[in-house]
Amino acid sequence: MKVILPLISFILLLTCGSPSKPILKISTGIKNNKVVWGDTLQLKLKDKIENKNIQFYLNERPIKKNHVFTNEPLGTQRIKAIITNDYGKRSTEISLTLLAKAPPKLFTYNILNSFPHKITSYTQGLEFDGDLLYESTGLNGQSTLKTLDFKTGEVINNKPLDESYFGEGLTILNDKIIQLTWKSMKGFVYEKATLAIQKSFPYKSSKEGWGLCNDGKVLYKSDGSNRIWILDPTTYKELRSIEVMTHKAPLHNINELEWVDGKIYANTYQFNKEVSVIIDPSSGTVEGVIDFSGLKELVEQHSQLNVLNGIAYHKTRKTFFVTGKNWSKLFEVTIEPKE
């Protein structure tokens, strides 16, 4: 006991007398942690560490203390500082939000034609292949993949999904149809000519299936958040994602997608209005908002009538076709600047 007590006292003395590690805090010189392209960081480290070397990183890429934001993809920006001195390394990290530089432009529509659309179709995906219209519909027990004569609404081919699946967006690439399901963490690949299922694929990072389109090389998938995921065209694995942002905030609830002339046109549940947005896929910038107000009032009004959802571009006619969940009409429109 005589030996143990002095030893314990010595250990306690060392512990109590040991200096604590200095608190590290990054100063950015940015108000509200929100930036746009053209803004300059003024990075400093608030600490009391002596004889140190500091390296700053933006999304794991080394940057200078006075970094200027230029064309980075929008959304969350992670800034890390790694401090090195004779005693080793320490690090600290903060996040900023990179917003769009300018507000989106406003657009409206001009109706050219209206065509019959099955009032029982809970539309989730819409895309043309030549003059043939492909449609994916939702709801458990009612979900289908079908081809249509867009002028008459006649169903040419119909492939029901198992009642356990809730159908979502679709797109056509390399003579294959790719269709999403909502919460089953699974998509399906079909032979375009026959609608025969070839295989399925899992979701990994993206937890739900909403909208789908392609640029001829890769697929773009929405999951109900403000992210659009880029998928490998062969394995359908998520390669990376972009964050969809306005000049004020992230834009969530991105739904049905269509690729047109290098931009993504997307239906969305934002704003409590019948709107679509135009997205720059390289940055995530919302470049335009299309106000489709008034279209819903032109279809048959009934108890199951639901929101605008379904946008397809006809490459030959150079017009858009839009409809909604349980809408009785399919509208052919042009999109024009709003005055």
What kind of feature is each model-predicted range?
Residues 14-15:
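C-terminal motif of bacterial Sec signal peptides marking the signal peptidase cleavage site
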Residues 66-78:
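Solvent-exposed segments in extracellular or luminal domains encompassing
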Residues 119-130, 163-174, 204-216, 248-262, ...:
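Beta-rich, blade/repeat-based domains predominating
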Residues 112-144, 159-171, 324-326:
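Beta-strand-rich domains and repeat architectures in extracellular enzymes and scaffolds
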Residues 99-119, 150-156:
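A short helix->beta-strand "capping" segment at the edge of beta-propeller domains
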Residues 148-153, 191-195, 233-236, 280-284, ...:
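Short loop/turn segments that connect beta-strands within beta-propeller blades
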Residues 135-139, 179-184, 221-225, 266-271, ...:
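Conserved beta-strand positions in repeat-built beta-propeller and related beta-rich domains
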